[in-house]
């Protein structure tokens, strides 16, 4: 019996050691699972301070406390064009001390950077993470509806419908008022242009007469020269004496025409020479009679433009065009 008792005692001791080992192992597993659970749920933390979005001038504004300077900074968000990624980029640019910035939903799920601000505002609330700090952001109920893209599209369609109705109802009235205005401007311009036309016509008549006299004087000089050479050749002297004289006279004429080219940069032709004499005489007489050539040219251009606009306004192809298109055509002219 003593030997049997000695054999049972080591067996009981070994069983107790095994139970103690299992207990320690279970405690380590529970501690590890608790640590893992706490680390896996670390992104969902208590927020440092709540933030709220407000709306000013139709745009949402968010005041975010920057971690580096510990001061609030206002950020303007554009619902239709900005995204969460652009908001995060704006935060990084404003504070270089921000290493990590993200936006989470209320359930702890991170939102993609491609999510639009319009969609984010429709959530009503979300969480903003700056480094290790979390901020609960709330959106007022009145701020989520005006930035619905569907409502904006409906508003654009309504605006286009109103514009088309306005164009259809007011295009005739616009054309009549525009035509009346153009006729009044044309009448005023023609009234100012009429006395200048009379003065110009009088100066032109005087210049035409002067140019004709100059041309006939040149023809008479050539005739006198021809008669003088004929008299000297057949009556006074012989051809042997007059041949060198006529040669030098002809060569002198060539030199004179070349000098005319150097002075006017034009070849010597009778029509161009006559036009030059006429133009010089016209400007000389206009200055003498106080005729404003620049004013006359400006009025002539204005009258031509007004007549072209009236012609375009009365064109059958432009009868059913909208007012905005007609205004653009007139602005181009």
Curated annotation (Swiss-Prot):
**Disruption effect?**
Null mutants are viable and fertile, but have strongly impaired mitochondrial calcium uptake following laser or needle wounding. Reduces the wound-induced transient elevations in mitochondrial reactive oxygen species superoxide (which are known as mitochondrial flashes or mitoflashes). Double knockout with the srb-13 xm1 mutant suppresses the sperm navigation defect in the srb-13 single mutant.
Q: Mitochondrial intermembrane face: residue ranges?
A: 235-243
User: Topological domains (Mitochondrial matrix): residue ranges?
Assistant: 23-214, 261-333
* Gene Ontology CC annotations of this record: uniplex complex
Q: Which reaction does it catalyse?
A: Ca(2+)(in) = Ca(2+)(out)
- Region spans: Outer juxtamembrane helix (OJMH): 195-213
Q: Which UniProt keywords apply?
A: Calcium, Calcium channel, Calcium transport, Coiled coil, Ion channel, Ion transport, Membrane, Metal-binding, Mitochondrion, Mitochondrion inner membrane, Transit peptide, Transmembrane, Transmembrane helix, Transport
Where is this protein's transit peptide?
1-22
- The annotated region (Inner juxtamembrane helix (IJMH)) lies at 262-271
A GO biological process held by the record: mitochondrial calcium ion homeostasis
Q: What is its main location?
A: mitochondrion
Q: Which membrane topology term applies here?
A: Multi-pass membrane protein
Mutating residue 238 to A: what's the consequence?
Strongly reduced sensitivity to ruthenium red inhibition
Give residue numbers for sequence motif Selectivity filter: 239-247
| InterPro entries (alphabetical) | MCU_C, MCU_fam
* Coiled coil start-end: 180-193, 289-316
Q: What is known of its domains?
A: Forms a well-packed pentamer with an overall cylindrical shape. The inner core of the pentamer is formed with the second transmembrane region and the second coiled-coil region (residues 293-316): while the transmembrane regions pack into a five-helix bundle having a largely polar pore across the membrane, the coiled-coil outside the membrane forms a pentamer with a hydrophobic core, which may contribute to stabilizing the transmembrane pore structure. The transmembrane pore is wrapped by the first transmembrane region through contacts between the first and the second transmembrane regions. The selectivity filter (also named DXXE motif) connecting the transmembrane regions forms a pentameric barrel that constitutes the mouth of the pore. Inside the barrel, both acidic residues are in position to form two carboxylate rings: the Asp-240 ring is solvent exposed, and the Glu-243 ring is located deeper, guarding the entrance of the second transmembrane pore. In absence of emre-1 regulator, the calcium ions cannot exit the channel, suggesting that emre-1-binding induces conformational rearrangements to allow calcium to exit.
The text of the family note is:
Belongs to the MCU (TC 1.A.77) family.
What is the protein name stated in its UniProt record?
Answer: Calcium uniporter protein, mitochondrial
Organism name: Caenorhabditis elegans
